[in-house]
Amino acid sequence: PPWLPIGLQHVPKKTWRPPIFGTGTFGRVHLVKEKAAKNYFALKVMSIPEVIRLKQEQHVHNEKSVLMEVNHPFLVKLFWTSHDDRFLYMLMEYVPGGELFSYLRNRGRFSCSTGLFYATEIVCAIEYLHCRDIVYRDLKPENILLDRDGHIKLTDFGFAKKLVDRTWTLCGTPEYLAPEVIQSKGHGRAVDWWALGILIFEMVAGFPPFFDDNPFGIYQKILAGRIDFPRYLDFSTKDLIKKLLVVDRTKRLGNMKNGANDVKQHRWFRAVDWDAVPQRKLKPPIVPKLCSDGDTSNFETYSENDCETTSPVSEKDLEIFKNF
């Protein structure tokens, strides 16, 4: 839209609210208000020295390039990026409902119909990304936000990657890593379908299928592939999860020749009108409580790191981000 800010002067620092939530160790997200149009945005502010120290340069560039390319109702929108000699800035749409993670923890677990609603929207988002040769690689409840109506928005595209061939880096959250990622066999679209299986299990059971006190223990359980289902889960729910959590990725649902259609045609989704899903026509099971457009009560607020203590970086380091 034409009213979007061209420079940070349009988002004066005094209009920044306290950070909404941390984005790892090198970034914070602020709620900002565009004065003239009174629109709220999320401004992600990342410390360049920290990004470099943690070797996250590629992830930051990936996030920008992927978000600039996509446009889908279930993916968070990026409007503008910029940088100065200390920080990188990404101005994104503000999604006020908070993380799916919070709702799941508050309820303990979701009913099958609630889990199914979120799964349908996530399937559409994954299918859209995969059609563009993008692997998301970080599907988990913390990265799924709810908009004001209760529909999903995937956020945090730092691990997302445009596929040229199978990729080889180990990234993601231990409980959600696919076997081929742990075994360094290279991984493509199949990792997102594995993560969907983990997510559906966690939504309807209240805990992930593979967990342990340390990552190595989790990895062993993932590779063994044994799933203990709670007794109350019905056959079709268990069947879908089993077919998504197949260790051999060539036999994993979603990763065979019919791609996402195999997932969409599974009996668990038999009542779903797939054309209606991306049009946001399905009725959300949870509608976030909001008092106003700029309400941040669905997020935990974090104390402000003192941005002023971040030193400017050298010209050489700044060169890495010249196109940001």
Listing of model-derived features with the role each one plays in the protein:
Residues 28:
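Conserved N-lobe ATP-binding subsite of Hanks-type protein kinase domains
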Residues 80-81:
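A short, aromatic-enriched beta-strand patch in the conserved N-lobe beta-sheet
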Residues 40, 45-71:
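Conserved N-lobe beta3->alphaC-helix segment of eukaryotic protein kinase catalytic domains
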